[in-house]
Amino acid sequence: MFALAQHTARRTLSRQQWTKVVVSAANYSSGSLSSTIRISSIPAPHTGEITVLSLNRPRARNAISTALLGELNTVVEQLHAQGDKSSTRALILTSESDDAFCAGADLKERLTFTEEDTRNFLKTLRHTFTRLSTLPIPTISAISSIAFGGGLELALCTNFRVLASTASIGLPETRLAIIPGGGGTYRLPALIGETRARDLILTGRRVSGEEAYFIGLADRLVQISEQELGEKGVARGRVLEEATAMAKGICEGGPVAIRAAQAAVSGWRDGEGSENKAYERVIPTKDRLEALTAFGEKRKPSFQGR
């Protein structure tokens, strides 16, 4: 689907296989070794695929550099350009590193920026994050470790967040004498409410996976046992497994219906108009008739996305 070569994983993977897959990136991920994002895919139910984007700057804790941002922007724009013709039915953001989902901005690179460089970087960052947040397909972040600053803002751009109990997230920008600049000051309040968002942003404190789930910042919480804590790749594999299960569960629905529902919910502020417009997309589909036929025949429907 993308310019980078892709590797398709098997439809069903055990927990042990997932752990092995995550630890051995070469067996699962694709793309050049110098790539800051690795792209892979998993077959989705019925048709199409679930695309997995793995941030791949382990030495920098996946900090958002100009190069990483450029690659992310390219992938997001390709998905938008493909529209309904895209074979990607859901998107998962994860990490190639046990140590970090994303530590935020690349501060070492930022030290070399002029004020104009900083403004230009933020302009690209905001554009890319907004485009990610408006993709017509379900998007999920899988986080097992740290997601700070721009890393958390990146996760806020996805529809869902799966966190491990080992995760630690926050918006510490005020402690660096700045404020969140990638959407944190408006996406976080929209998600968890103004008061809780103000608490996290003004204090800059870190939040555990459990607290994130409690306040509604995480949609799924994966508990990691004490025994599993010391096992390489396990927490990362577990959240990816849960995120994939969530994506597959979503993709059990009709492809056109999932996109229509995504659009309707995104337009909830428009009320009935958004829903009615989205419903018109599914009425003429063959998948709708297939679902009715399958119900009458007491079998599972087979959707083709048309």
UniProtKB/Swiss-Prot annotation:
Q: Which reaction does it catalyse?
A: a (3S)-3-hydroxyacyl-CoA = a (2E)-enoyl-CoA + H2O; a 4-saturated-(3S)-3-hydroxyacyl-CoA = a (3E)-enoyl-CoA + H2O
Q: Which residues form a coiled coil?
A: none
Q: Say if the entry is tagged with keyword ATP-binding.
A: no
Q: List the EC numbers from the record.
A: 4.2.1.17
Q: Which domain of life is it from?
A: Eukaryota
Q: Name one GO molecular function term.
A: isomerase activity
What keyword terms does UniProt attach to this protein? Isomerase, Lyase, Virulence
Which residue positions does UniProt flag as site: Important for catalytic activity?
Answer: 173
Q: Where does substrate bind?
A: 103-107, 150
The record ties this protein, via InterPro entries, to: ClpP/crotonase-like_dom_sf (IPR029045), Enoyl-CoA_hydra/iso (IPR001753), Enoyl-CoA_hydra_C (IPR014748)
Q: Which GO terms describe its biological process?
A: fatty acid beta-oxidation
| One GO cellular component term noted in the UniProt record for this chain | mitochondrion
Pathway noted in the entry: Siderophore biosynthesis
**Role:** Enoyl-CoA isomerase/hydratase involved in the biosynthesis of a ferrichrome A-like siderophore which may contribute to organismal virulence. The first step of siderophore biosynthesis is performed by the HMG-CoA synthase (HMGS) MYCGRDRAFT_54740 which catalyzes the generation of HMG-CoA and CoA using acetoacetyl-CoA and acetyl-CoA as substrates. The enoyl-CoA isomerase/hydratase MYCGRDRAFT_76805 then catalyzes the conversion of HMG-CoA to methylglutaconyl-CoA. The acyltransferase MYCGRDRAFT_85486 then fuses methylglutaconyl-CoA with hydroxyornithine to yield methylglutaconyl hydroxyornithine.
User: Of which family is this protein a member?
Assistant: Belongs to the enoyl-CoA hydratase/isomerase family.
Q: What is the name of this protein?
A: Enoyl-CoA isomerase/hydratase MYCGRDRAFT_76805
The source organism is Zymoseptoria tritici (strain CBS 115943 / IPO323)
Q: Which lineage do the record's taxonomy fields give for this organism?
A: Eukaryota, Fungi, Dikarya, Ascomycota, Pezizomycotina
